[in-house]
Structure formats: structure tokens, C-alpha cells
């Protein structure tokens, strides 16, 4: 898959903000704060489209990136970051819930990014169960895999495959080594991204 053009077309800050026109589907990137969503989007597009930071909570809005004038990459705010205000966390939750309920019909695949160094967190589990209830297809992207020793890595991959691997794709991924990028492109093509 080759990404020829990328354009940020809409940023959603509030649940009543208007969504962009629909295209040939949406590929959603969601996960805890500081798990690497923005870095992954930058790698996939070959451009610095999403702001990155070592400090969690950088993405505070829903960002719609038009890819090849055909479909969207949708970058959702990270969840689970304790150092933002209760009001800000509530706003993020509301716009994320609103997005999934209003745009589920146009979502091709949700990439759920999970820090592969750790077992499933409660917030991640709640999200995955909710995506199942909404009958949305998702793939689990295990981030930061380059930080694990081979034995730890094999253990964590086995852990996630035991939990979700029978029905969902598990992708070990590293921003450093680029492991997993080809699999993500392949899924985008399979699910209709051209």
C-alpha cells in the first residue's frame, strides 16, 4: 500500500462538532495515553502529521486525516491519563463515545494500541468489550515490543493471543524497528483502504 496524499480535514473537540463528509471508510487508532498512536500514524503516512510528545495526553481531539482522497485515518484522544482534569477526561470520553456511536457505520477497522510490555489494563478491556458489543472489527497492536527481551516478548504475545487471538488479529509492533508496519498496511488493504 502506498500513501500518496494526507490531509488533516477535521478536528473534533466537542461531542456536538460536525463530522466530515463520509468517504470510503475510516480506520481508527485508539489506545491509552502515550501508547504511540501519533507515532504510528506518522510512520504509516511517512509524514509528521500527528504531534508526538513524551508527555501523555498530547492528542486532545479527534483528528480526521484524509488518505489518498479515499478514506480516513482517525486519531482518537488517549484514555487513562490521570494528570488531566476530571472535566477534560470526561470531555475526551464523551467525544470518543459519541464518535463510535455516530460513525460505527463507516468504520472499517479499529486499531487498538496496547503497550505490549504489560498485561491488559482495565480501560483497554472495557474498550475491547465495547467494540465487540458495537460489532466493530478490531486488531490489537502491541506497541513498544523492541523494549522486551525475546522470552518476555514471546510470553506477552502468547498472553494476548490467548485472550483475543482466535477471533482478532494481534500485531507485535515497534516504532524503532518498524516491525508490524507491513501487517497494518495489509489489514488496511484487506478492509478496503485503497
UniProtKB/Swiss-Prot annotation:
Binding site for Mg(2+): 38, 59
Residue span, EngB-type G domain: 23-194
Keyword tRNA-binding on entry: no
A cellular component annotation (GO) from this entry: cytosol
Binding locations of GTP: 31-38, 57-61, 75-78, 143-146, 173-175
Biological processes per GO annotation: division septum assembly
Record flagged with keyword GTP-binding: yes
PROSITE patterns reported for this sequence: G_ENGB
Obligatory cofactor(s): Mg(2+)
Gene Ontology molecular functions: GTP binding; metal ion binding
Swiss-Prot/TrEMBL keywords: Cell cycle, Cell division, GTP-binding, Magnesium, Metal-binding, Nucleotide-binding, Septation
Protein role: Necessary for normal cell division and for the maintenance of normal septation.
Protein family: Belongs to the TRAFAC class TrmE-Era-EngA-EngB-Septin-like GTPase superfamily. EngB GTPase family.
UniProt cross-references to HAMAP family, sorted A to Z: GTPase_EngB
PANTHER family named among the record's database cross-references: ENGB-TYPE G DOMAIN-CONTAINING PROTEIN, MSS1/TRME-RELATED GTP-BINDING PROTEIN
Protein name: Probable GTP-binding protein EngB
Amino acid at each position: 500500500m502506498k500513501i500518496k496524499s494526507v490531509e488533516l480535514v477535521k478536528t473534533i473537540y466537542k461531542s456536538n462538532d460536525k463530522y466530515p463528509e463520509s468517504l470510503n471508510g475510516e480506520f481508527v487508532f485508539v489506545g491509552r495515553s502515550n501508547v504511540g498512536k501519533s507515532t504510528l500514524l506518522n510512520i504509516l503516512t511517512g509524514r509528521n502529521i500527528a504531534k508526538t510528545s513524551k508527555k501523555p495526553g498530547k492528542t486532545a481531539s479527534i483528528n480526521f486525516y484524509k488518505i489518498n482522497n479515499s478514506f480516513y485515518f482517525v486519531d482518537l484522544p488517549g484514555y487513562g491519563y490521570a494528570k488531566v482534569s476530571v472535566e477534560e477526561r470526561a470531555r475526551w470520553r464523551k467525544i470518543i463515545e459519541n464518535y463510535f456511536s455516530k460513525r460505527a457505520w463507516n468504520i472499517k477497522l479499529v486499531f487498538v494500541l496496547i503497550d505490549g510490555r504489560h498485561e491488559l489494563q482495565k480501560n483497554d478491556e472495557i474498550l475491547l468489550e465495547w467494540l465487540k458489543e458495537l460489532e466493530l472489527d478490531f486488531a490489537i497492536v502491541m506497541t513498544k515490543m523492541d523494549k522486551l527481551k525475546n522470552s518476555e516478548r514471546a510470553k506477552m504475545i502468547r498472553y494476548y493471543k490467548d485472550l483475543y487471538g482466535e477471533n482478532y488479529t494481534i500485531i507485535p509492533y515497534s516504532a524503532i524497528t518498524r516491525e508490524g508496519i507491513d501487517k497494518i498496511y495489509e489489514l488496511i488493504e484487506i478492509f478496503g483502504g485503497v
